[in-house]
Amino acid sequence: IDEIKAYLAQPDIYRPFILCEYAHAMGNSVGGLKDYWDVFESEPMAQGGCIWDWVDQSFREVDSDGRWYWSYGGDYGPEGVPSFGSFCCNGLVNAVREPHPHLFAVKKVYQYIKSRLIDNENLTVTVKNWYDFTDLKNYTLHWNVTADNGNILAQGEVITACAPHETVEIVLGKVKLPRDVKEAYLNLSWTPNQASAFMDTNYEVAYDQFVLLANSKYEAKIDLPSGTKLERDGYTWFN
């Protein structure tokens, strides 16, 4: 990433920076995509890159006990012949196109609708439309505030216009948290208004979740060992 930034800092560049393979989707992988995309989205000359690869290159075989399994490089060839072991199983989906868990991480980073919470009390978000040709009025925002006990405290739907590559501010309003709520979450989900060949109107194209400030009147009961001091630093973990 530092090398990308160094290239982009040159005053005389005229070609975009494209990474032919910036992530390898083998096993528990693709966890660092957001760091790259922070650069791609902030630097016009950073065009993007390619993930290796889309699908596991494997075959369905049956063992001597009649059980099927996905085979890969190490299952073939005479004994003693070098192979790359499981190297061929490096896709975002398996051989029959069923998603691996890390495909959902890719979808989250790649989503074209990205939100940011800017007001915790009178719930307000800014929404960036990263589509090149599609207005946000073609999608519906479904939102809710859910307490840590699972109860939905408020919910609604919003359709708003926002041209490609523009940002819009959406005010959802104040939501009163019950006294026994320690933490609440603002959940945002976007779905298309019209079905297409690739998705129906229930398909989630983008989502975000934000942790809201805990109810200041709620005091957690904490049993501390004798001589232990509890310090409150106001730190809140959020996504």
Predicted regions and their residues:
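Residue-level detector of beta-strand face positions
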Residues: 126, 142-144, 187-189, 229, ...
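Beta-strand-rich N-terminal accessory domains
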Residues: 192, 215-239
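C-terminal regulatory/interaction regions
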Residues: 130, 149-151, 175, 227-235
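Extended substrate-binding grooves/exosites of carbohydrate-active enzymes
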Residues: 1-126, 130-137, 142-152
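Short beta-strand elements
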Residues: 195-223
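Intrinsically disordered, low-complexity Pro/Gly/Ser/Thr-rich segments with frequent PxxP/GP/PP motifs
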Residues: 140-142, 146-184, 190-193, 198
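Generic structural detector for well-ordered beta-strands
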Residues: 116, 126, 157-161, 171-173, ...
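N-terminal accessory beta-strand-rich subdomains and adjacent acidic, glycine-rich linkers
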Residues: 186-193, 206, 238-239
